[in-house]
Amino acid sequence: ITPKKKIENAIQVVGTNGKYSLCTTLREIFETAGYKVNMNISPSLKKFNERYYILGKHISDENLYNLLLEVEKINSGQNITFHEFICACFFLEASRNRSDVNILESGLFFRLDASNVLEKNIASVVMPIGIDHKDFLKKGTIDEIVYEKCSHLLNNSKIIISEQNDEVLKKIKNNINDNSSTKIFFNENFIYKKNKYDFVYKDDFGEITLPLPNLSGDFQISNVSTAICTIRNLK
């Protein structure tokens, strides 16, 4: 069995903005509830080890060194990109350290991303999409970007779409129209309202009043709300 086939209960996160905040919020909620979590982020912020969060901690320098050497040996000099290499490292390490949930942040896009090798997941989350990495595309239009990020999300799962501008939302809906997954949209299936000292999250399961996130920017409320929605829809 290849390492990727051992990655169970995966949540795949795509988009332009807020992916890291979403991933870390999901991780904190799961761990607070007692679940074991593996997480792969891209890029790292301060140290390369941050990319691989395995069962409660970032990979150590020694384990990272040995992992990189092992995957390099397995690759046997074949052509491979940096992102493909580091994704392969995560899949191998995560397959050896089984968790209750695996959180995967996609790279530049998703359709051809090295993280897009799973055959099933428990959710795909689409964070706010904007113009990014135009140099890697033929035209660099928002249509092309939305296609790359959303057209190949896995079927038979859940797709949670975070707060988007109206133009992007229409394009996302067009791209996932034929996807068999259950679709959950901000402003249709879940909402939030900011108050002075707290905010109210509401969806089909009810509403929750929570303190404001200890992070600057109202967009963080949106990120937290998307994380809550994702977890509440994993039933």
Label the predicted regions:
Residues 3-6, 32-119, 131-140, 144, ...:
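ATP-dependent carboxylate-amine ligase catalytic core
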Residues 97-106, 112, 121-210, 224-235:
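Acidic, Mg2+-coordinating active-site environments of NTP-dependent enzymes
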Residues 26, 30, 87-94, 224-234:
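Buried hydrophobic packing segments
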Residues 37, 215-227:
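Short glycine/threonine-rich catalytic loop with a Thr-x-Gly-x-Asp
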Residues 75-79, 212-218:
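A short glycine/serine-rich beta->alpha loop
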Residues 11-13:
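Hydrophobic anchor at the beta1->P-loop junction of P-loop NTPases
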